């Protein structure tokens, strides 16, 4: 290779296209097309994703409360002690 970047050796049967940094736009249509597309995708996948998170949250909170309850001593077992 031995050449500087941008003037690399030519390869046969390889077509490459380039665009000047002055001709390209960094974020074209981000606000006009990008954000509405994100909102549309969230709205479409809401009912596929949210129920699973709700079920996971309910199971997690139940398990945490049950674990904390099982760590406590039962006061009824010690009523006859002096």
Curated annotation (Swiss-Prot):
Regions crossing the membrane: 40-68
Pfam families, per database record: UcrQ
InterPro entries in UniProt: Cyt_bc1_su8 (IPR004205), Cyt_bc1_su8_sf (IPR036642)
Protein's cellular compartments: Mitochondrion inner membrane
One Gene Ontology term, aspect cellular component: respiratory chain complex III
Membrane side Mitochondrial intermembrane: residue ranges: 69-82
Biological process, per Gene Ontology: cellular respiration; cerebellar Purkinje cell layer development; hippocampus development; hypothalamus development; midbrain development; mitochondrial electron transport, ubiquinol to cytochrome c; pons development; pyramidal neuron development
Modified residues (N6-acetyllysine): 33
Gene3D superfamilies according to UniProt: Cytochrome b-c1 complex subunit 8
Modification type Phosphoserine: residues: 16
The keyword Transmembrane helix appears for this protein: yes
Membrane topology designation: Single-pass membrane protein
Entry annotated with the keyword Mitochondrion: yes
Residue ranges that the UniProt entry lists as topological domain Mitochondrial matrix: 2-39
Post-translational modification N6-succinyllysine, affected residues: 33
Keywords: Acetylation, Disease variant, Electron transport, Membrane, Mitochondrion, Mitochondrion inner membrane, Phosphoprotein, Primary mitochondrial disease, Respiratory chain, Transmembrane, Transmembrane helix, Transport
Purpose of the protein: Component of the ubiquinol-cytochrome c oxidoreductase, a multisubunit transmembrane complex that is part of the mitochondrial electron transport chain which drives oxidative phosphorylation.
Reported disease: Mitochondrial complex III deficiency, nuclear type 4: A disorder of the mitochondrial respiratory chain resulting in a highly variable phenotype depending on which tissues are affected. Clinical features include mitochondrial encephalopathy, psychomotor retardation, ataxia, severe failure to thrive, liver dysfunction, renal tubulopathy, muscle weakness and exercise intolerance.
Subunit structure: Component of the ubiquinol-cytochrome c oxidoreductase (cytochrome b-c1 complex, complex III, CIII), a multisubunit enzyme composed of 11 subunits. The complex is composed of 3 respiratory subunits cytochrome b, cytochrome c1 and Rieske protein UQCRFS1, 2 core protein subunits UQCRC1/QCR1 and UQCRC2/QCR2, and 6 low-molecular weight protein subunits UQCRH/QCR6, UQCRB/QCR7, UQCRQ/QCR8, UQCR10/QCR9, UQCR11/QCR10 and subunit 9, the cleavage product of Rieske protein UQCRFS1.
Family: Belongs to the UQCRQ/QCR8 family.
Protein name: Cytochrome b-c1 complex subunit 8
Organism: Homo sapiens
Gene: UQCRQ
């Amino acid at each position: 290779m031995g050449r500087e970047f941008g003037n690399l050796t030519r390869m046969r049967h390889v077509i490459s296209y380039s665009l000047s940094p002055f001709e390209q736009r960094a974020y074209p249509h981000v606000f006009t097309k990008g954000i509405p597309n994100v909102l549309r995708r969230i709205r479409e996948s809401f009912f596929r994703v949210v129920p699973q998170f709700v079920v996971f949250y309910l199971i997690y909170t139940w398990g945490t409360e049950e674990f904390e309850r099982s760590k406590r001593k039962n006061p009824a077992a010690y009523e006859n002690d002096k």
